[in-house]
Amino acid sequence: MRIPHQAMKTIIEVDGAMGEGGGQVLRSALSLSLLTGQPFRLTRIRAKRDQPGLRPQHLAAVQAAAKVCAARVRGDRIGSEAIAFEPGPVRPGDYFFDIGTAGATSLVLQTLLLPLALAAGRSRLALRGGTHVPASPCYHYLDWHWRLLLARLGVHFDLALTMAGFYPRGGGEVQATIPGGSKPRSLQLMEPGTLRQIRGLSAVANLPREIAERQRRQALRRLRALLPSSEPEIVVEELPAVGRGTVLLLLAELDAGQACCFGLGAPGKRAEWVADEAVDALAAYLRSDGTVDPWLADQLLLPLAMGEGPSVLRTSEVTPHLLTNAAVIRLFLPIEIDVDGPLGAPADIQVQPAARPPDGMTIQRRGHVS
């Protein structure tokens, strides 16, 4: 689905206090504005956070989105609780964005990826900041998991990690190569099937390799107790980085479903606890009948909303981010998104783009995948 930038110039009013009331509202609105060409006004930014308003990494997302479409923006400053964003056409090209210290590169990348992937032209992004930081998908989650599911939908790009950036030093760098011209397909994922494989990564940066080995041993011990018939494979790596940090990431591959969970190290946090964090999250997913983990369910909503037809999948858990993202998407697109389950429980998610788009809207049609 592509929407001409000349159409639908009515300003969309977005309440930043909706749903979980955090940065998700802002990032979703920015992506949708780039995709549809529709301007928006966002008020009460991050109203439910201890420090409301734009923080540095949120401002970086606004400025990055504005740069790729030459947008006119008002209110783009630290602490601002309201912005107005009027986009121009998305311009493929080479861009560099410095998020600052340990600001999450993944969140800015996810804001820009789909608009650039659907644009007619090649783009390259370089983002500097945090690559493995709390409250955001780490780089390896994006590369091992998110990227592959988007490719299954017909959205193609490549990622590379030049330097890891852990909290609080940051200083990492991620590069994305986006060929452009992607046309998202619909997706049917209702039955996860049987577990085929568990792969993992235990990595350290500027810390003894033995810490990564301890993380690996604990994860393998726990996984073999939980899943006696499984043969997990976890590799150990030392990542180049400015600061210090650790990560333990697990990817479960099922017949049709897929889930990725990870734990991050922190001062005073034992290596075994990092592994337990990832294993506990993966075990919770495997106890459900979900086809995707709760984080991916949230991240797939927008690509599915831009797809050519109805999609359905099952999440292992309904999260506030999922419901918030759905609410913002409904403001910009004539679409039905049904989440058939309560907060915190597994649920079916159905995404139905409009069968008859409004005047000026063009929908590109392709087949679905299952």
Language-model features, listed with the residues they occupy:
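A generic, well-ordered mixed alpha/beta core segment in the N-terminal half of proteins
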Residues: 59-160, 175
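Flexible, glycine/charged-enriched surface loops at secondary-structure junctions
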Residues: 72-76, 122-123, 156-164, 223-242, ...
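N-terminal glycine-rich anion-binding loops that anchor highly charged ligand groups
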Residues: 23-43, 53-54
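Phosphate/diphosphate-binding glycine-rich loops and adjacent basic-rich segments that engage nucleotide
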Residues: 86, 90-92, 98-105, 118, ...
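Internal helix-turn-beta structural module
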Residues: 303-370
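Conserved mixed alpha/beta catalytic, RNA-binding, or beta-rich assembly cores of soluble enzyme
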Residues: 135, 185, 191-294, 312
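Beta-rich nucleic-acid/ligand-interaction surfaces
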Residues: 134-137, 161-175, 235-244
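N-terminal basic/disordered segments at the start of proteins
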Residues: 10-33, 368
